[in-house]
Design a protein with these regions (language model features):
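N-terminal lobe/hinge region of extracytoplasmic solute-binding protein
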Residues: 43-95, 126, 230-234
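A structural "hinge/loop" feature
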Residues: 45-64, 87-88, 114, 137, ...
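Aromatic- and charge-enriched surface segment that lines or borders ligand/interaction sites
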Residues: 89-140, 194-196, 281, 328
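Gly/Pro-rich hinge or "lid" segments in bacterial periplasmic/extracellular proteins
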Residues: 153-182, 191, 199-266, 274-276, ...
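Extracytoplasmic/peripheral linker and loop segments enriched in polar/acidic and small residues
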Residues: 176, 186, 381, 433-450, ...
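Extracellular/periplasmic solute-recognition and catalytic clefts
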Residues: 241-249, 268-326, 349
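Ligand/substrate-recognition segments at binding pockets and active sites
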Residues: 245, 393-464, 539
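Structural transition elements
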Residues: 357-395, 412-418
């Protein structure tokens, strides 16, 4: 409440000084715009980075720093999110997409001048796998051969509460591994890396753009130790220059193979106590960009008219999973009826205050993706009351007669309660189906999910990649436990919550125990509908108009390589000056 009040007062003060009421001219930018004379990018990114290690980076600002100082086999084009060459100049698939060969460039160097080799990638990936649950995104390597493991003796730890980081595995915990194949990443030479996968993945080059796949230079194999900034060797466009309690300063890397294309001389991650101080720094001209600030719906509405305010769909999905082990939710007609009776546009607009985007499919749309093929239905879950009632009648429940009360399980969270009540009202209005809303604290909620004590349950995921197989297997596959991003998704919409509080909120996402055919594609997921998407989160940024190349995307993963300060930027002519002419 205190943080929310402070934000409201901050905006009220800002608007009154700027003369931004409805009957006055609205300034185009939020705060002072003074073009810097140097190529230094000052970035308030939700706090200061807490780790410099690709294996331990869970979320921004840690992942943003890792992307700046380390480079992987591929990188994302920040606009299209297509994989582009990085350390690897080219790659090729064989064996139906189960084997990938990457060819490394000759001029890739570490910051000490040493050559970046294929073996660096092998050792780094093996280190991450050995870290297990200590590394927040180890599961992204799960499709590589030789990473399989089978739990025995001990029970699985519960997913951490949103207010707590995951606990390291107990030393008394026993884990038995199945007889393993050799590790699937192999250095055929210094310049050639071959990777064997458990399942075909034609989008694997997109997956390895994730920070967890970026190599580190290790003199000794110490898997449990985090890399420290002092003396850190890196291979990216920037290297660590200075660190203290108020900032992290990066400098353009002199040994980077593509340094001629890097305009920025330095990047400064600027610390901020909270959202209010970050916005105040931006308004006064102290920083060039603000991202990962916990903005309330009111603040979002007040910022929306400004030209330098950006809003982008973020790949954090809230979805509802059906317990298909229970009748009548084992009937696809029932699941589809419930799915298309929901007005997702209204949920996003009314129930979340316009702070989310309606999710009518499981994966956020990217600019270059091919259309989905869905048998006998639309590839989007559009509201269709007539078809929903028809499907329910075909399933034996005309006008909802004799349909059991739906037990809808959600974790204790005000926004999730409001959304669940709205969806329950839609089911009652369209299908004449009643709902019992079951709200539980986090531990009890997770226990109910594990035991299957629900008909429908609210879940969440923060997608780490555009790789379709990885995202869909995270949602639906036994071998891909994924992340318990319900807590992260909630954090994005909780007033007063800061991004740095949630950097480690990743753990296994529980699934209903019923055995079902494997789902590897979004088209299969839309055909099966064992779960239904509800909404995507949104990410927000304030970026000064003289900053170019800072592109937002659904992964919330901007690249610094093409960012520059346009020293020749001039404000557009105001309507008043045009009329004077």
């Amino acid at each position: 409440m205190r943080a929310g009040l402070a934000t409201t007062l901050l905006f009220a003060s800002a608007f009154s000084h700027a003369g931004c009421f409805l009957n006055e001219h609205l300034e185009p930018y939020y705060g002072r715009v003074v073009v810097p004379q140097s190529q230094q990018f000052r970035w308030s990114d939700g706090g200061l980075p807490q780790t410099f290690d690709p294996a331990f980076a869970a979320a921004p600002p840690d992942t943003d720093l890792v992307r700046a100082i380390f480079e992987g086999l591929t990188d994302y084009d920040p606009q299209t999110l297509m994989p582009v060459p990085a350390v690897a100049t080219k790659w090729e698939a064989s064996n139906g997409g189960r084997t990938w060969t990457f060819y490394l460039r000759d001029d890739a160097r570490w910051s000490n001048g040493a050559v970046v080799t294929a073996q660096d990638f092998v050792r780094s990936w093996q280190r991450t796998v050995k870290l297990g649950e200590l590394a927040p995104h180890t599961e992204l390597l799960a499709n590589i051969e030789g990473t399989e493991k089978k739990a025995a003796v001990s029970t699985t730890q519960a997913t951490p509460q949103p207010s707590q980081p995951p606990r390291p595995a107990s030393s008394t915990q026993a884990t038995a591994r199945e007889p393993q194949q050799p590790f699937g990443a192999e250095a055929l030479s210094d310049r050639v890396l071959r990777v064997r996968l458990r399942r075909p993945d034609m989008n694997f080059p997109a997956l390895v753009a994730h920070p967890v796949f970026r190599p580190v230079k290790l003199d000794v194999d110490a898997p449990a130790g985090k890399l420290l900034p002092s003396g850190l060797l890196s291979n990216g466009a920037f290297s660590v220059a200075e660190t203290d309690n108020e900032r992290v300063l990066l400098a353009r890397a002199e040994n980077y193979w593509d340094k001629q294309q890097v305009t920025l001389q330095s990047v400064e991650f600027v610390g901020a106590r909270d959202t209010e101080s970050a916005l105040a720094a931006y308004r006064s001209g102290g920083v060039d960009a603000v991202t990962n600030a916990a903005l309330e719906p009111l603040a979002i509405k007040l910022l929306a008219p400004y030209t330098d305010f950006r809003r982008t769909t973020f790949g954090a999905l809230t979805y509802y999973t059906f317990n298909t082990a229970r009748a009548p939710f084992d009937d696809i007609r029932v699941r589809e009826a419930l799915a298309i009776a929901i007005d997702r546009d209204r949920v996003s607009t009314d129930e979340t205050g316009g702070a989310t985007e309606p999710a009518k499919r499981f994966l956020p749309q990217t600019p270059t993706e091919a259309p989905k093929t869905v048998v006998g239905k639309s590839d989007m879950l559009e509201k269709d009351d007539e078809r929903a009632r028809q499907l329910l009648a075909e399933a034996g429940f005309p006008d909802g007669k004799n349909f059991p009360v739906v037990r809808l399980l959600v974790n204790r969270n005000e926004q999730q309660r409001v959304v669940a009540q709205a969806i329950a009202a839609m089911w009652l209005s369209v299908l004449n189906i009643k709902t019992e809303l079951v709200i539980k604290n986090w531990d009890d909620y997770e226990a109910a999910v594990r035991s299957g004590d629900f008909d429908v349950v609210r879940r969440g995921i923060v997608m780490q990649t555009t790789d379709e197989l990885t995202n869909i297997r995270t949602l639906f596959g036994e071998g891909y436990p994924g992340t318990a991003a319900a807590s992260e998704t909630e954090r994005l919409h909780q007033p007063g919550a800061e991004p740095s509080e949630a950097n480690k909120l990743f753990g296994p996402a529980a699934k209903p125990s019923t055995t079902r055919p494997a789902i590897d594609t979004e088209a299969q997921a839309l055909n099966d509908l064992s779960a239904m998407p509800i909404y995507f989160a949104s990410s927000y940024a304030l970026v000064k108009p003289y900053v170019t190349g800072f592109d937002a995307n659904v992964l919330d993963a901007p690249s610094l390589k093409k960012v520059r300060i346009d020293g020749n930027w001039k404000p557009p002519a105001s309507p008043a000056s045009n009329n004077a002419r």
